[in-house]
Curated annotation (Swiss-Prot):
Keywords: Coiled coil, Membrane, Transmembrane, Transmembrane helix. Residues 93-128, 185-245 form a coiled coil. Belongs to the TEX28 family. This is Testis-specific protein TEX28.
Amino acid sequence: MVLKAEHTRSPSATLPSNVPSCRSLSSSEDGPSGPSSLADGGLAHNLQDSVRHRILYLSEQLRVEKASRDGNTVSYLKLVSKADRHQVPHIQQAFEKVNQRASATIAQIEHRLHQCHQQLQELEEGCRPEGLLLMAESDPANCEPPSEKALLSEPPEPGGEDGPVNLPHASRPFILESRFQSLQQGTCLETEDVAQQQNLLLQKVKAELEEAKRFHISLQESYHSLKERSLTDLQLLLESLQEEKCRQALMEEQVNGRLQGQLNEIYNLKHNLACSEERMAYLSYERAKEIWEITETFKSRISKLEMLQQVTQLEAAEHLQSRPPQMLFKFLSPRLSLATVLLVFVSTLCACPSSLISSRLCTCTMLMLIGLGVLAWQRWRAIPATDWQEWVPSRCRLYSKDSGPPADGP
């Protein structure tokens, strides 16, 4: 271990083998071993402080790296959401490189932090940590042959219980002082090693920070270019949207105007149709009323005519029954007048001179008249009695209608 290697370089390494170790001193006498135990306690306290300091430094560095990784992730998401699809693969490739580097750094820091926690736990438990031995072995100034380590780590030979008592008091301060000097040298070397590692880590962090800054600058440039392009595209989109809104508003006005005109026409047509329906209903009602009135009038007239016909038939029957001689006289009067005319004609012919009789014209005339008289007599005799019976009442009816008072109007 580191402390054992420091013992080989200290003056106590040249002591003879019969000098007892500090373990035998501390076990034999409590008084003289006090300064040695105090030196060991101070060294352990210094080691714990250095390990705690390193743990704090690594924790802070781990927090910074994680914050940087989260910031890179947020920037990557923003760029991907705003970038063109042709630029997305390049941005993704650059982000993967940075993310891999950051993940490796974080894993390395976490491994170191875990080792420091283990060292601190071992120091708190009272045993020497193995990590300090590894740090000492990594330093070429701390290398030593294994025989010397075995020589120092071996316990003292059993020389009996009187050995510690026979040790002179002058040699004890020398052993303790050499031990304390070796511990101080080991602490200084460990501190220098830690400082060198911190410097190397700081340089590495600075290099990564410079690379991250350069990448951040490139991302900012790409972000500004994408922002300008998006602003121009947004301006064009806003202009096209404004034009589309104006066009849509104009079309809406035209459509509303035409729709209003169509609605007005439909309203007018409905109104005219309603008026026409009302007019047709009124006219049909009036026509039906007139037809009904005319029908009622005709019905009343027909009923009156039927009643009048019945009355006239009854009156004609009563007249025929009450005055048959008068009807017979009226029927025979034309015959008598005809016979009178014939007699007058015959007497006139007889009174004419014979010269007229001898003439052919007169002869033909006489013959024609005689033939007509014979035909009329034969025709009169051929008419049956039933026809005369039917003809006489009808003539009487017509006569009674013509001679009677006029009927009432409708």
